[in-house]
């Protein structure tokens, strides 16, 4: 990993008036030029982290580092970060130009340079020609662009975004996701984005921190977190999931619903109780006799791109299926899936334990592969003789 631009070392936050611990020993490192997302429900602590980076809140314990320098005691205006708030925090009595130029005027930048830089950033956010437009006459999406332009005009090392898209309608929010991601990649600035919207996080991020109750419960790429949730909370919070109790018989073999299935996971104890996750889109509808499982369709909703089908197996387990194929309520269908569609979660495993287990398991597999290669090479030499 490159030298981190931002680092949290054992950071906690307690609100003394209520004695509420909203952050619990947070540790992470952020690289320069990436798009990070803090994802969690309301009250998970994600906005608290953002406010501590910005200097709007003090950490109770721990160190906050920016480029290797401790910044706990450095005031907000001296930190090379800029925040875009959910409310945008624009000045209603100023036009677009004056709002965007405001940070430069505080630094007493030359008038000609201000005009040049404002024109550049307004072009970046597709607001050319809006310089004299009143803030009050802008749409929600246009106000969002003004707030982003103001955030990047000083070319900060880090831009913090606190649920900036939540007030927009669905179509505009989706458009802004593309625009924000493209802008971040073009500028090469580190973005730290806060949201409770899982699809938003998956679509935009290089790296996601999933938060719950003041803790980071899992971090990783969007694909890693979606495909390999570490626990029940992550599996249900990130997308839809079918979760069932199971037993890991041995490496690559799991039992659930009274049957044994091939899997791709390993590194657990023989006959260890686990939770089995299968995503709704990974289930394929077949004839009952051709399916690995048989279920009875209970309800069906059309979601536009697919049907969302709820069905129950003979043990009473509920199954959600996403399919482009329409089912009939009351009919029995088969469900088929591949070994790689089965995700295994160890009970009560932390992210540190998960990473250590996977690392140890990979090392063992590599050693076994090396031993097999050595034996094969030895046989080849013997055959030559």
UniProtKB/Swiss-Prot annotation:
<dbReference type="Pfam" id="PF08402">
    <property type="entry name" value="TOBE_2"/>
</dbReference>
<keyword id="KW-0067">ATP-binding</keyword>
<feature type="domain" description="ABC transporter">
    <location>
        <begin position="6"/>
        <end position="238"/>
    </location>
</feature>
<dbReference type="InterPro" id="IPR003593">
    <property type="entry name" value="AAA+_ATPase"/>
</dbReference>
<comment type="subunit">
    <text>The complex is composed of two ATP-binding proteins (PotA), two transmembrane proteins (PotB and PotC) and a solute-binding protein (PotD).</text>
</comment>
<dbReference type="GO" id="GO:0016887">
    <property type="term" value="F:ATP hydrolysis activity"/>
</dbReference>
<dbReference type="InterPro" id="IPR017871">
    <property type="entry name" value="ABC_transporter-like_CS"/>
</dbReference>
<dbReference type="InterPro" id="IPR003439">
    <property type="entry name" value="ABC_transporter-like_ATP-bd"/>
</dbReference>
<keyword id="KW-1278">Translocase</keyword>
<dbReference type="InterPro" id="IPR008995">
    <property type="entry name" value="Mo/tungstate-bd_C_term_dom"/>
</dbReference>
<comment type="similarity">
    <text>Belongs to the ABC transporter superfamily. Spermidine/putrescine importer (TC 3.A.1.11.1) family.</text>
</comment>
<dbReference type="InterPro" id="IPR005893">
    <property type="entry name" value="PotA-like"/>
</dbReference>
<comment type="function">
    <text>Part of the ABC transporter complex PotABCD involved in spermidine/putrescine import. Responsible for energy coupling to the transport system.</text>
</comment>
<feature type="binding site">
    <location>
        <begin position="40"/>
        <end position="47"/>
    </location>
    <ligand>
        <name>ATP</name>
    </ligand>
</feature>
<dbReference type="GO" id="GO:0005524">
    <property type="term" value="F:ATP binding"/>
</dbReference>
<dbReference type="Pfam" id="PF00005">
    <property type="entry name" value="ABC_tran"/>
</dbReference>
<keyword id="KW-0813">Transport</keyword>
<keyword id="KW-0472">Membrane</keyword>
<keyword id="KW-1003">Cell membrane</keyword>
<keyword id="KW-0547">Nucleotide-binding</keyword>
<protein>
    <recommendedName>
        <fullName>Spermidine/putrescine import ATP-binding protein PotA</fullName>
        <ecNumber>7.6.2.11</ecNumber>
    </recommendedName>
</protein>
<dbReference type="InterPro" id="IPR013611">
    <property type="entry name" value="Transp-assoc_OB_typ2"/>
</dbReference>
<dbReference type="InterPro" id="IPR027417">
    <property type="entry name" value="P-loop_NTPase"/>
</dbReference>
<dbReference type="GO" id="GO:0043190">
    <property type="term" value="C:ATP-binding cassette (ABC) transporter complex"/>
</dbReference>
<dbReference type="GO" id="GO:0015417">
    <property type="term" value="F:ABC-type polyamine transporter activity"/>
</dbReference>
<dbReference type="InterPro" id="IPR050093">
    <property type="entry name" value="ABC_SmlMolc_Importer"/>
</dbReference>
